């Protein structure tokens, strides 16, 4: 048993009425697509067809399910995806009974419930609706903006066949003037904007100096004439040219008009009013509003009287962290010694005009290596990035002399300049840690975090886990990155001590899915890295996927593991969707495990009393036979292994947190700079 005791918590969930007989027997629709799509495109296309068909319709297997009768649906039409146009036709096949006790069939009913919620929210009057969020009361107002209070909602079906509603109070800041009017008041450019005539949002790149009457578009019309032909200028001034981009493809600038755009505001944009807005809610007030909104939704949507859901929760045992001896946090290892250290050479690059290592940094490093029983050589780079090839030569010589990582002391730099410098150093195989000056010895948290990041980039293992866990190898998979390309990244840790094995990246690919073959290629690399260190393959592997697991994404990898005789567990880790937890009595703390239905559980990995209502991770055990509590125990302990944070722990387990950092850093720097970088060095922390 891995828990220290149990308690009871309230969830921000409410039980509503049971499904009626018709809702348990949705219409089934066969889908024919012409031309037939490729394997990777089938499910996204079916989801697109469901939206095009209208009504309360969702994907079910290789067809559709609907709570709307076929006669009100759009049974044929065309749609486009990835540059290809498809014709679709739907054939009604009668009603199909679905059993809410069957996880697969319940997932279809839950998808229908979610679509029903969307459709009914859209029909509400006097409220602002965005997807599954509804805002109904004004909280604050200022010149040209207002803040609405409401909630983000979710609706699904329980295994008993009843609707379950989730409510999370939220705020929405709305701008009530065009971008042109907002800028005329002297405000800076917002980061995002939306169309004044619909809800589509854009990244705002810059203002243009072009004349909108003269700026030609591909169809032959000018920018101004194009919008006039769509009827968008009636009652509106066109304004100036603004260049925007789709958030999914920010490298492709699109011309727009400032009079047809509305700023999407954040608290940062309203920083002068931030103190008076008071948008953070104490947990007692959040829970009160949650109950109030649930009652309102139940009445307005005809879903019955909500009943608050309670759940049993278990406090997991606290991880035991080891440096040279037991520590409570990674920063302690700078004083007692690292878990695993070897002879190391570090270099300093100063861009602030000063010379040499600051004495307190030099002293801290020498003390840490002395406590670790390892030797340390400190170098100084006498070159500047502005020297071009001479700087590259200095880096090459440092690498030949055994330097493993570089600390850069610099005045604050623009992000573009930081990324350019980091990429230049990586090209020579030298990960870098950038630390802004001025820097004072009493700023211990700041410079100790920087030193820990530097040491991780040099390949040292600062801390380890002490204890026994089900999996000997944990691998995190994430798809993310910059612009329209994404990188499926894997970062892994050995279960016995949490030591980093390697990072690995495939070629860039489009979309949020990682192709089956790429998943296996990534996993195979980590298995070989484990074998090189241990002399054998692991007996069990823990596979952690950031977000939902697309259907069949891991099918090839799981088949290969089974052939090799390696046991496995596949867990989907979702940063959102876990809702909130409230104590029935007393207080909550880190390591709270809340088992739910269908191999699903909540895990509160990090909680600070002064930071509002706890937000647990939502985890789904997609495949494998390890008991949920044992999985929760290992995953919770893995959150303590992020080496570059000396005083606080991340919310995600280390393999996923590292994979997330990896794909984001590669998105910023590009993949071409990594050929000389050792796979065991965490250049991205």
UniProtKB/Swiss-Prot annotation:
The lineage of its organism: Bacteria, Thermotogati, Deinococcota, Deinococci, Thermales. It is an enzyme of class 3 (hydrolase). Coimmunoprecipitates with a number of proteins involved in DNA replication or recombination including RepA (initiates replication), AddA/B (TT_C0638 and TT_C0639), ArgR, GyrA/B, HU (TT_C0984), PriA, Rad52 (TT_C1923), RecJ, SSB, TopA and UvrB. Most proteins remain associated with TtAgo after DNase treatment and associate with catalytically inactive protein. Can be used to create artificial restriction enzymes using denatured tDNA and providing appropriate guide DNAs. This is particularly useful when cloning a region without any known restriction enzyme sites. Addition of UvrD (TT_C1062) enhances cleavage of supercoiled plasmid DNA in vitro. Addition of engineered thermostable SSB (ET SSB) allows cleavage of linear DNA and GC-rich DNA and enhances use as a artifical restriction enzyme. Can be used for genome editing. Belongs to the argonaute family. Long pAgo subfamily. It holds the Pfam family Ago_Mid. Changing residue 478 to N: No cleavage of DNA or RNA targets. This is Protein argonaute.
